[in-house]
Amino acid sequence: MNTEATHDQNEALTTGARLRNAREQLGLSQQAVAERLCLKVSTVRDIEEDKAPADLASTFLRGYIRSYARLVHIPEEELLPGLEKQAPLRAAKVAPMQSFSLGKRRKKRDGWLMTFTWLVLFVVIGLSGAWWWQDRKAQQEEITTMADQSSAELSSNSEQGQSVPLNTSTTTDPATTSTPPASVDTTATNTQTPAVTAPAPAVDPQQNAVVSPSQANVDTAATPAPTAATTPDGAAPLPTDQAGVTTPVADPNALVMNFTADCWLEVTDATGKKLFSGMQRKDGNLNLTGQAPYKLKIGAPAAVQIQYQGKPVDLSRFIRTNQVARLTLNAEQSPAQ
């Protein structure tokens, strides 16, 4: 009878109460049980008070209770009915997994990026080609226009040019024809050309005595000499001396151009006068003189070599870009665009 009564009394007690009673019978404290089971004191207290911590899974709680029962010498079979009530097994909530592949997403993104890159590259190449074609076409049109304009100017000048007839009238008296005074520096008071004793050849009355404009002025210190002496045959004497004739000096601002291929060219000086405008053929050369600075338009810069003030002019920047050269040569030989 006593055994059955004890058994019924144990069944009436909860799992936590039975564990607490067994611990007290063994003289153990909650701190000692927690140290032996490697648990927190709060966890031991919750087990004895039949509390199930919310942050503790039921599987772990069952394991702690079984360890506690073995420590206080209580059979596990006696605690199983109470465990079902105190720590029932709860179904774990598993979040549904998304069925996608990170590799596929990355590969798809890389594909779009590569497509966009190729598209941008094709657009840039197309725009560059269109710009080059338009620039080349504009240069060709400009060269053609300048060549046509030059041809029109040349044809207009040829139509306006007329030959001036010489005055061949026979009414001119050869005796009245006189020569300009020769450039003679004398210190004597009277200078007269001696008469020619030898017979002179007959002179056509229609011919006029022409004196070169390069003769200098007469600078005398006494009475001027007679302008002409008539020979017995009526021929005008030749001047005996042409002092003071100066040799022409080369212009330091001369523009020298040598052509290695056919090239259209236009040169204008500071006064706006066109020194040259037209087409120059291969192996040709051109020597121009005017008032600096010069403005040049060259259709093919690679086909011409320019020297200004004895120094070559650099056209490499126009040759590299294959453009019509527009430059100005000033007195300091600094070509400007």
Curated annotation (Swiss-Prot):
Residues covered by the HTH cro/C1-type domain: 19-71
Q: Where in the cell is it found?
A: Cell inner membrane
Q: What InterPro entries does UniProt report for this protein, alphabetically? A: Bact_Cytoskel_RodZ, Cro/C1-type_HTH, Lambda_DNA-bd_dom_sf, RodZ, RodZ-like_C
**Keywords of this entry:** Cell inner membrane, Cell membrane, Cell shape, DNA-binding, Membrane, Signal-anchor, Transmembrane, Transmembrane helix
Q: Where is the composition biased (Polar residues)?
A: 144-167, 208-218
What do mutants without this gene show? Answer: Affects the lengths of both the long and short axes of the cell, but especially the long axis. Cells become shorter and fatter and form round or oval shapes. The deletion of both zapG and rodZ genes causes synthetic lethality.
Q: Which ranges are annotated Low complexity under compositional bias?
A: 168-207, 219-235
Pfam families tied to this protein: HTH_25 (PF13413), RodZ_C (PF13464)
The source's domain of life comes to Bacteria
Q: Which residues lie on this side of the membrane: Cytoplasmic?
A: 1-111
- List all topological domains (Periplasmic): 133-337
Q: Name one GO biological process term.
A: regulation of cell shape
Residue ranges of region Disordered? 144-235
Known PANTHER family for this protein? CYTOSKELETON PROTEIN RODZ, PTHR34475
Report the sequence similarity comment from the record: Belongs to the RodZ family.
| Assembly | Interacts with ZapG.
- Domain notes from UniProt: The helix-turn-helix (HTH) motif in the cytoplasmic domain of the N-terminus is involved in the formation of spirals to maintain the rigid rod shape. As this protein is anchored in the cytoplasmic membrane, the HTH motif may contribute to protein-protein interactions to form the RodZ helix, which is localized beneath the cytoplasmic membrane. The C-terminal domain may be critical for determination of the rod shape by probably interacting with enzymes required for synthesis of the peptidoglycan layer, including PBPs in the periplasm.
Q: Which HAMAP family match?
A: RodZ
What is the protein's known function?
Cytoskeletal protein that is involved in cell-shape control through regulation of the length of the long axis.
Q: What is this protein called?
A: Cytoskeleton protein RodZ
